[in-house]
């Protein structure tokens, strides 16, 4: 079994030393879904929410969060992202919104956590903006879809 890299031989948490690793192109894609009442979905879809453009604000929040991942997750390295793209898919039949985030950098460690953080904060922002009309929204299916780069190469869910 592979050991957890964020713990030393005595079991103490530490930030992994990536100083000796070559900088390579890194890419990660994550996704998640938020389900809501049909009336709430209509507000989001039609842009009729009194707080403004729900998806536009969620996009900016997701981008900002990805850039702050190292500040939120204790053992993450600060990463100079070269790209963070956020896409929304409106799932009419489910009254749901799917968010996908793609993070890229040229670095010594991966960007999976940045993509996952972007997705989570984007979904939480949608929840925050819509909670006054629908407290029963459900965030689900947050996961890494793919990662590429570094020693471990390409991985896909």
UniProtKB/Swiss-Prot annotation:
Which InterPro entries does the record match to this protein? MoaC, MoaC_bact/euk, MoaC_sf, MoCo_biosynth_MoaA/MoaC, Mopterin_CF_biosynth-C_dom
Q: Which keywords does this Swiss-Prot/TrEMBL entry list? A: Lyase, Molybdenum cofactor biosynthesis
| An example Gene Ontology biological process | Mo-molybdopterin cofactor biosynthetic process
Which pairs of positions does the record mark as disulfide bonds?
none
Subunit structure, interactors included: Homohexamer; trimer of dimers.
* Biological role stated in the UniProt entry: Catalyzes the conversion of (8S)-3',8-cyclo-7,8-dihydroguanosine 5'-triphosphate to cyclic pyranopterin monophosphate (cPMP).
Similarity comment text for this entry: Belongs to the MoaC family.
Its name, as the record gives it, is Cyclic pyranopterin monophosphate synthase
> What is the organism field in this record?
Chromobacterium violaceum (strain ATCC 12472 / DSM 30191 / JCM 1249 / CCUG 213 / NBRC 12614 / NCIMB 9131 / NCTC 9757 / MK)
Its gene name is moaC
